Amino acid sequence: MLTVETLERPEAATDEWLRLGVRIVVTGRGGANSQTVLQQVLALFWPVAELYDFYATPYPRLPDATVLRIAFDLPAGYEAGVSGIVQSIGGAGWTVDIYEDGEQAACWKPEDGAVRPLCDHFHSAEINLIPSSHLAEFRKSAAPRLLQ
């Protein structure tokens, strides 16, 4: 079972925010590798984002692999965008897409010349940055309150 330890922070409500969704495939038996990657990702984004949700499931395409799905809520004023997120995670070989509607995405796969981000257990990843106005109403009402 994966665990998360976070510090208490004062919160203030905002009307607009960004949902950061991170989906990472982690290799290796047991939960140790997944726990390590989860803690690394939390350390990268906890200073600027609120943890919304996370869970892990087996990855059916690769034996002994786990899919980590981690969601954060960022203040609307977060200007670094998905490119800044990719830079924080590191590695090389990311494919970044920025759409006209404000959504942003990035993908990393172990292909020619790609430099693995975070650790050797990092198999692949997808990142999505979605404005709160694009989320379904039930997702908006469940959102945590964010720092101003």
Segment roles from a protein language model:
Residues 44-48, 62-148:
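Charged interaction segments
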